[in-house]
Amino acid sequence: MRPCFLVVDNEYPGSISTRKLVLESAKLNVLTAYTADEAIRVIERFPNIDGIVLDTQLKGRPCAEVIGLLRNSHKNMPIITVSPSGHDPCGGEQFHVSTFDPKQLLEAVRQISPTRMSYVVKRENEIVSGVGSP
């Protein structure tokens, strides 16, 4: 089963998030939210996601507050914070990446969900080699 991540992004809701595209191109399932409140609703509806990718520049609430709200209902949920400066203004999340580095984002995702990511790689290799096809 593919890993599923929630991307909480400050981009315009009608646009396609770059981070979402990066994760989808790596064969992950991606849910999106554009506000803290929307992120909380999504995580309540889909509690078994593998992690959250959080833009630290969300409008409306400081990122530390958003993380606190998310942690209220999902204490151990891995959160990858993303900021343009490369430093974590939210208070020391375990995973932090620069906004403009897709490789860093994918590496953080692999660290969060290594077993499920290895399934994705294995399945992709099977498809490419023709193994397991009908």
Sequence positions of predicted segments:
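Short hydrophobic/Thr-rich beta-strand motif most characteristic of the beta2 strand and flanking loop
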Residues: V7, K27-Y34, V42
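Conserved active-site segment of CheY-like receiver
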Residues: N10, T81-G86, S98-T99
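CheY-like receiver
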Residues: R116-P134
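Alpha2 helix of the CheY-like receiver
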Residues: I40-I43, L106
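A short, hydrophobic beta-strand element within the central beta-sheet of small alpha/beta folds
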Residues: I67, N76-H87
